Every structure is written in C-alpha cells, then in structure tokens.
C-alpha cells in the first residue's frame, strides 16, 4: 500500500480519540456516521459534476481535487466503521484480472 494511504490511515485512527475542536476529522467522528455519510454523498456529487466539466473543458484539475476529497471522506467512513484502506486494496487485488462480468456474476445471489 502507498505510504500516503498508510500515513493517512494512521492519522484517521488517531483522530478517533481527539477532541472535536482539535481537527476536522475529529469533528466528523464526533458528529457521527450520518454526518460522515452525508460528506461522502456530497463529495460524490461534486466529483460527478467535476467529471462532466472536465469532459467539456479538457481541464481535469477540479476533477482531481474533488476525487481526492471523495477518497478522503471515503477513508474517514471506512475508519469510522473500523476498516483499513488495505481491505479495499485487497478487494481490488482479488478482482484484478477478473472480467467485470465474471466478478459481477460471482456476487449475484443464487436463485
């Protein structure tokens, strides 16, 4: 896993025990999962809009910025639920080289 993701995971974990006024992440944890999920939703919409703008203009700088925000808030969500980013990377590794159709079919419940 990248050093950046590991370092960020460590900081996110440490912020769980911090006072809400000490950092943005600590304040999110203090407000609870619903607030964190609200931020993930907000950043998702902003990322989609930035992608549409990038497609029209060819400038991807805002798309990169919004994607970083989305990833960040997704990592906060995972940490709030006791998950480490490595779990997502492991899932991506598991899927690598597997056709998207085969992977989706493997997730379908049997009838």
Swiss-Prot record:
Could you list this entry's UniProt keywords, alphabetically sorted: Amino-acid biosynthesis, ATP-binding, Cytoplasm, Histidine biosynthesis, Hydrolase, Nucleotide-binding
Q: Which GO terms describe its molecular function?
A: ATP binding; phosphoribosyl-ATP diphosphatase activity
UniProt keyword Nucleotide-binding, yes or no:
yes
Span of the signal peptide? none
Report the subcellular localization: Cytoplasm
Query: Any S-S bridges, and between which cysteines?
Result: none
- NCBIfam families noted in UniProt: histidine_hisI, PRK00400.1-3
Q: Which family does it belong to?
A: Belongs to the PRA-PH family.
The name of this protein is Phosphoribosyl-ATP pyrophosphatase
Q: Which organism is it from?
A: Azotobacter vinelandii (strain DJ / ATCC BAA-1303)
Q: What is the lineage of its organism?
A: Bacteria, Pseudomonadati, Pseudomonadota, Gammaproteobacteria, Pseudomonadales
């Amino acid at each position: 896993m990248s050093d950046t993701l590991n370092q960020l995971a460590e900081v996110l974990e440490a912020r769980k025990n911090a006072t809400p006024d000490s950092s943005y992440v600590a304040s999110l944890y203090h407000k609870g999962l619903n607030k964190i999920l609200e931020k993930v939703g907000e950043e998702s919409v902003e990322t989609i809009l930035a992608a549409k703008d990038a497609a029209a203009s060819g400038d991807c700088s805002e798309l990169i910025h919004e994607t970083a925000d989305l990833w960040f808030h997704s990592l906060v969500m995972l940490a709030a639920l006791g998950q480490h980013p490595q779990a997502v990377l492991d899932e991506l590794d598991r899927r690598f080289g597997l056709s998207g159709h085969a992977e989706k079919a493997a997730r379908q419940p049997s009838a």
